[in-house]
């Protein structure tokens, strides 16, 4: 069930992504245009399980999970752009290039994920992604996801 306003709530996200707690890292899609871009949000809570060890007394959202959140946003954009996949097909995170971390993300932050579709060829799609907190870039990267059959 897709809304006409180009937003997606958590129930709609769960229909598209196979991820579940504690690894579902997109809370809401704020806006998207098929084949072009997507803006989503990840609310960073102190209750996230990894904050116990990353780092005690100075909790920082792990950089690899920022990349994973951006990858999940690219997966949602890919699903919304291509439509339903064949049974047994999934989008897999295939590559990340030029990742740069500009500022830490901490509990209480709201991370805005912005992904832009670049091109698709033979089931492999390229995207550019940016994660922002309070309008400031926290992370940026180029990413690829691939449409593949589950084995």
Swiss-Prot record:
Localization: Cytoplasm
Signal sequence extent: none
Keywords carried by this UniProt record: Cytoplasm, Lipid A biosynthesis, Lipid biosynthesis, Lipid metabolism, Lyase
Any one GO cellular component localisation term in the record: cytoplasm
GO biological process terms held by the UniProt record: fatty acid biosynthetic process; lipid A biosynthetic process
Recorded catalytic activity of this chain's protein: a (3R)-hydroxyacyl-[ACP] = a (2E)-enoyl-[ACP] + H2O
Matches recorded under InterPro entries: FabA_FabZ, FabZ, HotDog_dom_sf
A Pfam family of this chain: FabA
Annotated GO MF terms: (3R)-hydroxyacyl-[acyl-carrier-protein] dehydratase activity
Entry's EC annotation: 4.2.1.59
Main location: cytoplasm
Tagged with keyword Cell membrane: no
Catalytic residue list: 54
Cited function: Involved in unsaturated fatty acids biosynthesis. Catalyzes the dehydration of short chain beta-hydroxyacyl-ACPs and long chain saturated and unsaturated beta-hydroxyacyl-ACPs.
HAMAP family reported for this sequence: FabZ (MF_00406)
UniProt xrefs under PANTHER family: 3-HYDROXYACYL-[ACYL-CARRIER-PROTEIN] DEHYDRATASE
Recorded family membership: Belongs to the thioester dehydratase family. FabZ subfamily.
Protein name, UniProt field: 3-hydroxyacyl-[acyl-carrier-protein] dehydratase FabZ
Organism of this sequence: Pectobacterium atrosepticum (strain SCRI 1043 / ATCC BAA-672) (Erwinia carotovora subsp. atroseptica)
């Amino acid at each position: 069930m897709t809304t006409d306003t180009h937003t997606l709530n958590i129930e709609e996200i769960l229909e598209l992504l196979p991820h579940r707690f504690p690894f579902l890292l997109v809370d809401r899609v704020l806006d998207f245009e098929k084949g072009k871009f997507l803006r989503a949000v990840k609310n960073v809570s102190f209750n996230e399980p990894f904050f116990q060890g990353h780092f005690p007394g100075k909790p920082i959202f792990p950089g690899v999970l920022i990349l994973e959140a951006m990858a999940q946003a690219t997966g949602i954009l890919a699903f919304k752009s291509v439509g339903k996949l064949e049974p047994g097909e999934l989008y897999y995170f295939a590559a990340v290039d030029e990742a740069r971390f500009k500022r830490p993300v901490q509990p209480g932050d709201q991370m805005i994920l912005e992904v832009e579709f670049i091109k698709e060829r033979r089931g492999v799609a390229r995207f550019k992604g940016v994660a922002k907190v309070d309008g400031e870039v926290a992370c940026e990267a180029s990413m690829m996801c691939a449409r593949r059959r589950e084995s």
